[in-house]
Amino acid sequence: MKNREDITNLLNPRSIGCELGVFKGDFSKVLLDSGKFDQLYLVDPFSGSIQSGDKNGNNIEVHDGESLFSSVSKRFEYVNNVFITRQRSHEFLSIFRDNFFDFIYIDTTHQYDQTVLELELSYKKIKNNGIIAGHDYHPQMFGEVVNAVQFFSKKYNLPFSLTTDDVLNTYIFLIQKQ
């Protein structure tokens, strides 16, 4: 898989998905434009000062959480299958029954403990044959993400693949539950 946009080619129609960590909603738009989602949840606390770059880590921008929430809300206000939730990822995932989602994309704090928690909760909430993926698999810039993904992979004996053309790779787990 060349880039994270290609993930949508793996999705079935009528999927239920969520993006954990939304920033300005650019990747949310890619997911939505794929036409694969019956329900797409965009989850972010949108609080405080939020900093992010483009998908390759360049062009760093800093925004106020309230402004981002307002902007993302306006961007998707007429889309009836998008649900924007101001919540921490682990709180959001805990609400849903196990085996609910077809797709979960993680791009949040980049901290080891939080990423492990999100992966563990995602594994419970993802359906068999679902996809758990996430951004910023880059040893030099986001070593904690790399370590968390490798820990999760070993713990559950789950292989993963990486995008090949992104500077900040996306990791992809194709989930096969017993």
Indicate residue ranges for each PLM-predicted region.
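S-adenosylmethionine/decaboxylated-SAM
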Residues: 4-178
